[in-house]
Amino acid sequence: LGRYLFYDGRLSGRTHPDSLMSCATCHLQENSFECGIDHPVYQEGHPHGLTGIPTPHLMLPLINLVWNHNGYLWNGRLWKDNPDPYRRNIEDLVWMGVVAPHEMNGDTNRTKALIASIPGYPPLFKKAFGTDVVTMKRISMAVAQFVRTFISSNAKFDRYMRGEVQLTPSELNGFVLFTTEEGADCFHCHGGFGNPLFTTNLFYNNGKDTVFPGIDDRYAITGDPMDLGAYKATTLRNIELTGPYMHDGRFATLEEVINFYSHGLEWSPYINPLMHHIANGGTQLTPTEKADLIAFIRTLRDEEFLTNPAFGPPDQLP
């Protein structure tokens, strides 16, 4: 049921061909359920909704979210203990996507009425929930459960860790750089040996800026000045397919990202203390080290995830 709804443009509550929009309109499987810089409609990875209003940030990929317990979106404004009961989990993300002006710009009553009117859907709700009554809560639950099945665990690096393949010398050197403070120092925020998610799902000021309006960063949620300029550390799984990078898409390529961490960091009083190389402006990687690091990061590409038909569009919608 969730798979059908995820791919059904009528989730927007409309039937006109120019007004159809589904979750999959922006969240493309081939881009790790992110938009990607090469999206056929949204140039340079900057999506907008049916109203033409651009999204305030680049989207985050929908990958391994079942293990994210530290909040959703770039600033974590949805978290499990949020006093607002409608801003807590993936189900609420689905709801928000339907009504947000920069996404489907829909109306929940219109959406549930339209879905209920499609003959194939009530029997599917009956199978899933024991009743054929369509509600927005059940729509959100079904889509959220489908999204929770988006698990990536079979990249080349996963197979290396299972002893099934070997890394090249360049990839292996990149792995060493990734997991050492003296190297590229990536692992504090993006995991390593003991964190196969390749993210902590936490929020960091990583030295991108020196001026912070505090409007949409982590500070806007916590009110803690040390969260000024802090945004979620994204997973690095399939990262080569999810550019442009950072919350505002300022870097188009992985090479630009690595150059930034190597020699482009900017100090501020709010820099995260894990940015150990801030005094030098970055990790000062050599060209060979940069190439090795990118070679390792590309071992996190999971072709099985990107092509799994269970995650893809159904042959026919109800």
Q: What is each PLM-predicted segment?
A:
Residues 1-318:
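Periplasmic c-type cytochrome electron-transfer domains
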